[in-house]
């Protein structure tokens, strides 16, 4: 089991190394600083997300606080309305971050963004937050996307 987890992590790291950084809008990283956001594959923006596919997300950030844990909260914003966008594992400590999170340390957060087949073909904004134990944002970023068949 540990071998599979290590192989998955290595594959994710390899894929993210090939990814181009995306232009993002910081939406309130109150207790952290985003260094870089990568979504793979996303060669152009807005990112073209295809139904039934999964996209790797890698966020490099520096924490300005300590926290025992972290949780991701993802929304799709359609016409100004945030709609929950479930991800497989919202626990940041299982997404490449060694917890507890230390102040002034830089981390690489790794996760997947699954695009379900039943999602409508639509333009929207993905908002991705990673919150500390006090629900303050270690990072918050937004990017425009287009969901396609």
UniProtKB/Swiss-Prot annotation:
Disulfide bonds join 27-140, 42-47, 93-99. It holds the Pfam family E1_DerP2_DerF2. It catalyses: cholesterol(in) = cholesterol(out). Gene3D superfamilies: 2.60.40.770. GO terms for molecular function: cholesterol binding. GO terms for biological process: cholesterol efflux; cholesterol metabolic process; cholesterol transport; intracellular cholesterol transport. It is found in: Secreted; Endoplasmic reticulum; Lysosome. It comes from the Eukaryota. Glycans are attached at residue 58. Keywords: Acetylation, Cholesterol metabolism, Disulfide bond, Endoplasmic reticulum, Glycoprotein, Lipid metabolism, Lipid transport, Lysosome, Secreted, Signal, Steroid metabolism, Sterol metabolism, Transport. GO terms for cellular component: endoplasmic reticulum; extracellular space; lysosome. N-glycosylated. Found in the epididymal fluid as a 19 kDa glycoprotein that is processed during its passage through the epididymis into a 16 kDa protein. Interacts with NPC1 (via the second lumenal domain) in a cholestrol-dependent manner. Interacts with NUS1/NgBR, the interaction stabilizes NCP2 and regulates cholesterol trafficking. Interacts with DHDDS. Interacts with NEDD4L (via C2 domain). Interacts with NPC1L1. Binds cholesterol in a hydrophobic pocket; there are no hydrogen bonds between the sterol and the protein. This is NPC intracellular cholesterol transporter 2. It comes from Sus scrofa.
